[in-house]
Amino acid sequence: MARASIETDVAIVGAGGGGAVLALMLAQQGVRSVVLERASGPPQGLRGEILQPNGQRVLDRLGLLDKLPAHAVRSVHRFNFCRSGGERLCTVDYSDLPAPYNRAVVTLPNVAHHAILDALEKQNPGGLWYDATFTGLRFDGSRVVGLQATRHGEPVEVSSRLVVGADGAFSKVRESL
């Protein structure tokens, strides 16, 4: 079977928070990328998000923080951590930090992640590949020149100047080096 082939500046494996944010930042600077995501679509699980101050700053720079739906976010200035039974262990008070990021932002499941993925699709149409599995790196001598993958079960070869492994703690990209 002939292997499909594409060329891009950056190939990113993993469309979680790190990979998707990187791809969006690159797209906003005119850098072409392809993001391979093993899942068949955006995350749907019940996974709430807490945006820490630095994460809020990143979303703000991407132009997304103020676009999160108001009904799906809440600012929290203080967290109390307690033992089972109620004894307080410690308190984290975000109001001691400088504004405007002197809070944590708690969201309904996947709100921030979906906002990032939606913005990425608009900024880089066709650059986010679901049902795409990394199968190996491509080398020219000792230099990485891209990757091999399957997309919807079909083999594909990606040539790129840079490959980023944003595929988590058990990274297949890292294992391939």
Give, region by region, the residue ranges found by the protein language model:
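Beta1/beta-strand and adjacent pyrophosphate-binding region of the FAD-binding site
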Residues: 2-18
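Core beta-strand elements of the Rossmann-like FAD/NAD(P) dinucleotide-binding domain
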Residues: 6-8, 153-162
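Conserved Rossmann-like nucleotide-cofactor binding loop
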Residues: 18, 41, 170
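Glycine-rich FAD pyrophosphate-binding loop
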Residues: 27-47
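Active-site-adjacent segment of FAD-dependent monooxygenases/related oxidoreductases
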Residues: 52-119
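A conserved short coil-to-beta-strand element within the FAD-binding core of flavoproteins
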Residues: 130-144
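Flavin (primarily FAD) binding-site architecture
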Residues: 165-177
